[in-house]
Amino acid sequence: MLEVKDLHVCVEGSKILKGLSLTILPGEVHAIMGPNGAGKSTLSAVIAGKQGYEVTAGTITFEGRDVLDMEIEERAQAGLLMGFQYPVEIPGVKNIYLLKAALNASREARGESEIPAPEFMKLVKEKLAFMKMDSSFLQRAVNEGFSGGEKKRNEILQMLI
């Protein structure tokens, strides 16, 4: 469960969020909507731990943990991260290499050894099947020539791995 209680946030001295409260239960999907400048991106940035946002009051808890006390890496590992609205293309870098490098960097941060190739391929195949994605996707350059939907599925695949 994600719970935001009476959250107040300033950016460069300007009050952006003024007492926001929100509860999202496991399995629920919510859309945060509002006009430009309402604080949608600010809320996402604060939850993800982006620098430059000052929480002046309130709490954020995720699965019983105080999000505001978590490092950015801890938040990302817990699934609290921001996806790019327009993911960058990386010509010449295949998805399979990016996925393995990202996973091994995460494992290294936790003090774990690199994942063996057979174990990595098993994990990737499971996640591809879950996402209903073809394995040829792995050989394509990261986001290069992808449709909008493919870019989003690629981001979800990265998150799952």
Question: How does the language model describe each region?
Answer:
Residues 88-161:
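ABC-family P-loop ATPase nucleotide-binding domains
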Residues 33-35:
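The feature captures the beta-strand-to-loop junction immediately N-terminal to the Walker
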Residues 14-17, 74:
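Short coil-to-beta microelement around the adenine-binding A-loop and adjacent beta1/P-loop entry
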Residues 48:
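Helix-to-loop junction immediately C-terminal to a conserved catalytic motif
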Residues 59-75, 143:
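ABC ATPase NBD Q-loop/coupling interface
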Residues 2-4, 17:
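Conserved structural motif at the start of ABC-family nucleotide-binding domains
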Residues 31, 68, 76-85:
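ABC nucleotide-binding domain signature
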